[in-house]
Amino acid sequence: MKIGVRAHDFGRREIGEMAGLLHDEEYEAAQLALPKAFMGIESYDDITPEKLEQIRTSFEKQNIDIAVFGCYMDLGNPDENVRRYAVDTLKKSMTWAKELGAHVVGTETAYPRLNWELRQQWKPFMMDSILRGMEEAVRVDMPLAIEPVWWHPLEDLETTMEVLEKVGDAAHLRMIFDASNLLKHPETTDQDACWTRWLDAVGDVIDVLHIKDFSLDRRKIYQPEALGAGVMDYTAISRWLEKQEREIYLLREEMNLLFAKEDIAFMRSLGGPGFSGKHRE
């Protein structure tokens, strides 16, 4: 188990600065969305072999794993031009990620927040995009990791299993598991049962966990929280992690420097028998 962070939570930095900053903050791994993380890379069009080599060597020097090359694309969008750009960019990212030595290329399956009807309409387009992306993943031998989100076409366990079965290549199609993005009804969900069901079904293809916590205000508006201070219950996830013998990346999203050290301690506790429940002590 390695503890990491979404790099652009620290804002955009110079290429030579980011890895040292993450090392100093005691992280071991990172998720990199290059245009969001680095000055001098305004878009994917600005990625060059020279910049990739700068990033690779700086992270290697600081012993920071690039757990996820983030290329979050609108894969389910019915608009042909939008989807063509999404798939083409995802394919390019396979080569870029390979050059960086990244563990996986990560993506969700949509940009907007979709209602149920639209999620169903977008699913065939999502599936087509994933299949086309997988062709490149296999060609360059760079795993693609898909991230389910309840308001996207990849909305639930059943859809996720359907995609995994249709692709049928566990070596190249992996998963990022963000439990908070699957908690549609925090007030009524039995999280222990829910996360156990997910992990029993697809745990073997999960390489990365996104770790965050939140509360809902009186207007039901999402509010990021320190780990253990919100509605998330990580007990079942902790039990699963304790059994894993392979490397799993735990990446903090929505990092806040006010309680970043406490959050790192919380994440470290998830992998051991000392985890005492959902709330921090």
What are these regions (language model features)?
Residues 1-102, 174, 268-281:
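N-terminal pre-domain/capping segments
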Residues 6-10, 33-37, 71-74, 110-112, ...:
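Active-site beta-loop-alpha junctions enriched in small/polar residues
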Residues 10, 249-266:
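A short, acidic, flexible beta-alpha connecting loop/helix-capping segment that sits on the rim
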Residues 16-17, 53, 58-61, 75-177:
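Active-site acidic/histidine proton-transfer and metal-coordination neighborhood
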Residues 30, 121, 131-231:
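Acidic/histidine-rich catalytic cores of soluble enzymes
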Residues 37-42, 75-80, 113-118, 183-186, ...:
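A short acidic, helix-capping loop that chelates divalent metal ions and anchors anionic groups
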Residues 226-230, 235-237, 242-244, 248-251:
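H/E-rich (His + Asp/Glu) clusters that bind or coordinate divalent metals
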